[in-house]
Amino acid sequence: MPKYYEEKEEDKHPCAGVKEDLKSCLLQTDCVLQEGKSPKECLKEGYCKALQVTFFECKRSILDTRARFRGRKGY
């Protein structure tokens, strides 16, 4: 489920909810907090893999002409 913040402006871009959740997931991992690695390095190591796949599918559905009629995947 996406996390909503009252004081934050709503992003109108496609896949913004998934992107925000992926970013917050990466910033809360032990890889970033304790080991001091960058979120990019932690993403390559496999942290938050489900959200990464969901974000990829959402971005791909923007370009896929068949999926454009069915709607974007993700939230």
From Swiss-Prot:
Entry keywords, A to Z: Disulfide bond
Ranges spanned by the short sequence motif Cx10C motif, renumbered to the chain: 31-42
Pfam family, one: Pet191_N
Disulphide bond pairs: 31-58, 42-48
Function: Involved in an early step of the mitochondrial complex IV assembly process.
Family of the protein in this entry: Belongs to the PET191 family.
Protein name: Cytochrome c oxidase assembly factor 5
Annotated source species: Xenopus tropicalis
Gene behind this protein: coa5
